[in-house]
Amino acid sequence: MRKALNIPLEEFLRPFFGPGERICLRIFDDRKTGTFKGAKLETSLSGLPGLMDTLKKHNEKNRGIYFVVNFGGHEDSEITRINAQFMECDELPLDEQLKQIEAFPLEPSLIVKTRKSLHTYWLMRMC
């Protein structure tokens, strides 16, 4: 059984991004109930503390906050470095998701439990 950690956002993102690197964040109306069309934000590890109030306000409005896992920008065409392979499956119950993750031959680097799914990451090292 994996140990659950409650870690600061900066610590979670550190394996993906170096100091001073641009981190791209996307904010969506997860429940699709309002007129909010979404937002794209950019910061760095050192800039995260200054962005926390903004992120909390979005979260209080039931908006999902996601980071672009790979480095380079918000769009696929802007990605210049693969930081991790990742997957999620909202359609399966959490226990079934965990069974499939545990059956996979490569142990994940990180698993994040969200409201509906397990976000699973395999960190990459560029050679």
Predicted regions and their residues:
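Short amphipathic alpha-helix segments
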Residues: 90-106
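DNA replication initiation on ssDNA origins
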Residues: 1-83
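Acidic di-acidic motifs
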Residues: 81-92
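Structured loops at beta-to-helix junctions and adjacent beta-edge loops in soluble globular domains
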Residues: 28, 69-71, 90, 114, ...
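Histidine-centered divalent-metal-coordination microenvironment in nucleic-acid enzymes
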Residues: 87, 108-127
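Short, well-ordered loop/turn elements at secondary-structure boundaries
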Residues: 61-62, 80-82, 104-107, 114-116
